[in-house]
């Protein structure tokens, strides 16, 4: 049987590194279909840190796409597992027959599913991408994204799968012992990316709570984002006093980020698509409830796991937040499907499906 090849078709260092390390540490030892990768971006020590994997790096999207298409045409039994899919050339290859549906398996990352960009080239490309998506052999996604995808592509097979968030299961019960009182701290957004709609989120938080809460805005990623960070800072200072606004413009190491999250009382995410599942997982693990946009389909995954969900359209106050914290504290977090190690079973099944080992 031909070994499955995994494709990271866009240079997204943080997510690509997470996926590679997860496969190296959790999957490669038990499956030959978890070892071959084609990745856009620089090695930057990844090969050394992932010795169980065979990783081929490409300088750009186009060069990777050309290599994938050549492999697909040379051997129609060759299957590919696309993790996120931000590579237009690959979509066009699927649409034109360069890559066959039986060769194309796609793990939706959220941002690559929704049509939120307003630029002309995106508006021209989106209809073609929708046509190509009808030809995918199988999609893997959160419950909410599967539901969203099925509305336009009901005939495409869908399987539940969660991004492998880096988590320490031993911390699942730690939050239950913490006493929460005094001024609330609210985390706004999961990164410095504009898709977090930071300014709109800050205004929404201020409308709900006024200048009575401390707001923390992590903006250390992506790099070279100084102009937008300053824009958010000025908008924040027009709403909150200086001591109540903390904008982080340095990228935090994992343990420092975890410590930051555990100081919060609430996470506030205004974006209308599924994203930031890693931050949501870490907040929930710490017993911190999250406010979501009702258009963000991840609320379906949360309610399926019996987790409290607050919405941006709700009338929020401290009593409601504390009640959500109490409800979250009563949940057995060891049973949550999108937590580590529970998501591992979904990945093992996904590999078997994509490799053609199970129907």
From Swiss-Prot:
<comment type="function">
    <text>Catalyzes the synthesis of Und-PP-GlcNAc-ManNAcA-Fuc4NAc (Lipid III), the third lipid-linked intermediate involved in ECA synthesis.</text>
</comment>
<dbReference type="GO" id="GO:0009246">
    <property type="term" value="P:enterobacterial common antigen biosynthetic process"/>
</dbReference>
<comment type="pathway">
    <text>Bacterial outer membrane biogenesis; enterobacterial common antigen biosynthesis.</text>
</comment>
<dbReference type="GO" id="GO:0102031">
    <property type="term" value="F:4-acetamido-4,6-dideoxy-D-galactose transferase activity"/>
</dbReference>
<comment type="similarity">
    <text>Belongs to the glycosyltransferase 56 family.</text>
</comment>
<protein>
    <recommendedName>
        <fullName>TDP-N-acetylfucosamine:lipid II N-acetylfucosaminyltransferase</fullName>
        <ecNumber>2.4.1.325</ecNumber>
    </recommendedName>
</protein>
<dbReference type="GO" id="GO:0036065">
    <property type="term" value="P:fucosylation"/>
</dbReference>
<dbReference type="GO" id="GO:0005886">
    <property type="term" value="C:plasma membrane"/>
</dbReference>
<dbReference type="Pfam" id="PF07429">
    <property type="entry name" value="Glyco_transf_56"/>
</dbReference>
<keyword id="KW-1003">Cell membrane</keyword>
<keyword id="KW-0808">Transferase</keyword>
<dbReference type="GO" id="GO:0008417">
    <property type="term" value="F:fucosyltransferase activity"/>
</dbReference>
<keyword id="KW-0997">Cell inner membrane</keyword>
<keyword id="KW-0328">Glycosyltransferase</keyword>
<keyword id="KW-0472">Membrane</keyword>
<dbReference type="InterPro" id="IPR009993">
    <property type="entry name" value="WecF"/>
</dbReference>
């Amino acid at each position: 049987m031909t070994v499955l090849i995994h494709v990271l078709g866009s240079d997204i260092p943080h997510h690509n590194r997470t996926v590679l390390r997860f496969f190296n540490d959790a999957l490669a030892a038990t499956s030959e279909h978890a070892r071959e990768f084609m990745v856009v971006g620089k090695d930057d020590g990844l090969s050394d840190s992932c010795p169980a994997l065979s990783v081929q790096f490409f300088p750009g999207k186009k060069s990777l796409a050309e290599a994938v298409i050549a492999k697909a045409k040379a051997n129609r039994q060759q299957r590919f597992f696309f993790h996120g899919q931000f590579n237009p050339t690959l979509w066009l290859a699927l649409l034109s027959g360069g890559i066959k549906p039986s060769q194309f398996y796609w793990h939706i990352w959220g941002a690559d599913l929704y049509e939120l960009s307003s630029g002309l080239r995106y508006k021209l490309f989106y209809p073609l991408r929708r046509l190509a998506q009808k030809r995918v052999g199988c999609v893997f996604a959160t419950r909410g994204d599967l539901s969203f995808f099925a509305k336009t592509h009901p005939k495409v097979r869908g399987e539940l799968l969660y991004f492998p968030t880096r988590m320490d299961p031993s911390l699942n019960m730690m939050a239950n012992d913490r006493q929460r009182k005094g001024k609330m701290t609210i985390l706004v957004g999961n990164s410095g990316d504009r898709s977090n709609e930071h300014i709109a989120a800050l205004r929404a938080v201020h409308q709900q709570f006024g200048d009575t809460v401390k707001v923390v805005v992590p903006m250390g990623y992506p790099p070279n984002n100084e102009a937008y960070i300053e824009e958010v800072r000025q908008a924040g200072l027009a709403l909150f006093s200086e001591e109540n606004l903390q904008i982080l413009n340095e990228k935090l190491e994992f343990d420092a980020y975890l410590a930051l999250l555990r100081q919060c009382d609430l996470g506030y995410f205004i974006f209308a698509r599924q994203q930031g599942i890693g931050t949501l997982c870490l907040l929930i693990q710490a017993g911190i409830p999250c406010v979501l946009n009702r258009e963000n389909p991840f609320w379906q995954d949360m309610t399926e796991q019996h987790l409290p969900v607050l919405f941006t359209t709700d009338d929020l106050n401290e009593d409601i937040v504390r009640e959500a914290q109490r409800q979250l504290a009563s949940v057995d977090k060891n049973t949550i499907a999108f937590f580590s190690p529970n998501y591992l079973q979904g990945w093992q099944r996904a590999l078997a499906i994509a490799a053609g080992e199970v129907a």
